[in-house]
């Protein structure tokens, strides 16, 4: 499927879900069932759209349009630089933990063991 076809299919499914959702809110049980099934279909189509859009973006089929001047001006006003005053935190002292020695596993062998050999 082409990216445009997938987008159109997504729009159609969304419109269908919206119509049926209105009916389901009024108590129509069949419409509620259609909403559930269509939402599953929409999920599958959305996955296909994601894959296609990534593929199109990498191959250069999708190009981003430059932002208009009004949008750029609004963005710069919002992102006005604020003075950053940060006090350097004192370096934290490392917590020293005592390592406990491993328990010795030196058991004395019994005399009977030596006798068996």
Swiss-Prot record:
Pfam family, one: Hc1
Residue ranges of the region described as Disordered: 57-117
Compositionally biased tracts (Basic residues): 66-81, 95-117
UniProt similarity note: Belongs to the histone H1/H5 family. HCT subfamily.
Keyword annotations: DNA-binding, Repeat
A GO term, aspect molecular function: DNA binding
Low complexity bias spans: 82-94
Function: Might have a role analogous to that of eukaryotic histone proteins.
Record's protein name: Histone H1-like protein HC1
Recorded superkingdom: Bacteria
């Amino acid at each position: 499927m082409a990216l445009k076809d997938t987008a159109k299919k997504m729009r159609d499914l969304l419109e269908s879900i919206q119509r049926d959702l209105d009916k389901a809110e009024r108590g129509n049980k069949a419409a509620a069932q259609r909403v559930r099934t269509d939402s599953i279909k929409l999920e599958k189509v959305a996955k296909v759209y994601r894959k296609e859009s990534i593929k199109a973006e990498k191959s250069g089929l999708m190009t981003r349009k430059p932002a208009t001047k009004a949008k750029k001006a609004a963005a710069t006003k919002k992102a006005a630089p604020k003075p950053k005053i940060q006090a350097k935190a004192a370096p934290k002292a490392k917590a020293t933990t005592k390592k406990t020695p491993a328990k010795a596993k030196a058991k004395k062998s019994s005399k009977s063991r030596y006798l068996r050999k």
